[in-house]
Each structure stands twice: as structure tokens, then as C-alpha cells.
């Protein structure tokens, strides 16, 4: 007997093999073992893969489900007759009605390459046999749903177009008819509905929306003065010191009388402060008065006659001789 020698897998091949092996269902293997032995009457053995490797039991299985599917079953111990049995089984289950994506390849079983796919194929075959009416005591596989065709006449089809189910939706009732472009004005009434026009621009319906009432008419540039009253509304004007509780104003505050930055500031205002009655002591013969005028010597002489002699007294005689007293400069 010839055997294929296959070394261990490494790297990505080993990773893929381990991932496929992790999906293998041992409970499904036991159910398949019982189902195949019940249908064929043949024992698989302890090793599921080695018991099906020669393809003899598989050919007997499809012949039980569909008699005459495999006409010749090879019982040789050589590899090529065994591969031929597996190939005949694959062709037979395709003719039986199996989907191509549910069928395994010959190497998946013969070389133990992907026993998970072999298991998937046999479970699908059991479900297809159940669908065709082949029942056993082993409940395995899922029965395929049968096609149930319904035909309706034209009258029923047209009648259903006007019925909206509670669990269905429709887009026939809703449309964008009459919708205006974004940003344009919306009318408060529809001329087609023959409703009365609104009285003025300030009338807004409770169930409608409008942008007619709001505008930028009368809006001022940033920083300009705002009026407290509107002449169009025939309201009584108020003075500059009156500020409404619901309005704002900037008329009270101003820069009137403000001097240039860095200049001197007046301590008092002549309009509100009286002239001083007490004598003012000056530190010079001339100075600045309270009203901003200069004080002359005659004014100072009139205020202080005892101290003023017409001229300044010289404490030192004019013929005084200075001596160096031997100091060398």
C-alpha cells in the first residue's frame, strides 16, 4: 500500500491548519457516525477520517439515498482506486442536489486536509435527504424550505395598491410639492386653498411659520447711536436721562469735556464753584490764578502791602571783596 508522506506545517500553513481544526465539531462527528452506520449498515471504526478515507462507505451511502448513483465501487487498497471512489461520490451527490459550495474536495478527506469541510458536506447531505423524505432515527441536518408559489389575478394586485398596512411604510403620500428653496420666503396661505390673506406682516398663524415679521429694517451699524423711540410709531420722545427698562441707550455717557491724553485736568468748574474768599498763598511772584489767568506783581502788592517794598533787598554790599584765603583753585 502506497502512502503519501507529508511533513509538518510551519508558519502561515500551520496557523491556517490550526484555525480550521479549531472549528471541528466532535458532537457532529458522533451524530454523523451514527447516521451513516444506520443508513449503510457498515461500521466506520474509531477513527472517523480513516474509516471514510477509502470511499467505500461513502459510495454505499449515496447508493442507499439514491439507488444506482455509483455503479462500480473499488475495494482495492491502493490510493488511486480510493481516490476514484471519493470522486464518484462527489459527482453523485452533485446529481442528488447538493450545492457546489457545500461539497468538499477529495484531498480534504484523503490527506486529512480539511475534515471540517467534510463534516459540513455530510451534514448538508443528511438535511437534503430529510427534505426528500428519507427519515431515520438520528435527527441530523436541517430540512430545506420548499418553494411555495402564490399567484394573484390583476384585480387583487390593483386592490392592494390602495391599502397601507400597519407594519408597512409608503412614500406615496409624502412629497416635496410646494416646498421652497432653502432661504426663500414662505407664504402664510396657499392661493389654491382659497383662504383669506393675512391682515398684515405681523399676523402669524399658530400652525404655520413665517420669516416676514423679522427683518433688518432700521438696524444700525455697530457703534452708532440707537433711538429710544420710533417716529413711525408716533411715540412720545423722552429726554436723554430717561432709560426704559426694556431698552438700552448710550446717550447718557459721552466724551464731552474730556481733555487730550496727558494734559492737565481742572480741579473745579467755574460754572458750579464760587470764587475763593480766603487769600491764596503763592510760592512765586507770578503764577496761575484760579481762573487760569496770570497774577502780576501789582496784584501781589495790593494783597500784601507790608511785605512788598517795590524791590528786593540785597543782603550783601556791592563793594564786598572776596578773598581766596590762600585756597588754590
Swiss-Prot record:
The lineage of its organism: Eukaryota, Metazoa, Chordata, Craniata, Vertebrata. InterPro entries: Calponin-like, Calponin/LIMCH1, Calponin_repeat, CH_dom, CH_dom_sf, SM22_calponin. This is Calponin-3. GO terms for biological process: actin filament organization; actomyosin structure organization. Calponin-like repeats lie at residues 164-189, 204-229, 243-268. Residues 306-318 have a biased composition (Basic and acidic residues). Thin filament-associated protein that is implicated in the regulation and modulation of smooth muscle contraction. It is capable of binding to actin, calmodulin and tropomyosin. The interaction of calponin with actin inhibits the actomyosin Mg-ATPase activity. Pfam families: Calponin (PF00402), CH (PF00307). The modification N6-methyllysine is found at residue 158.
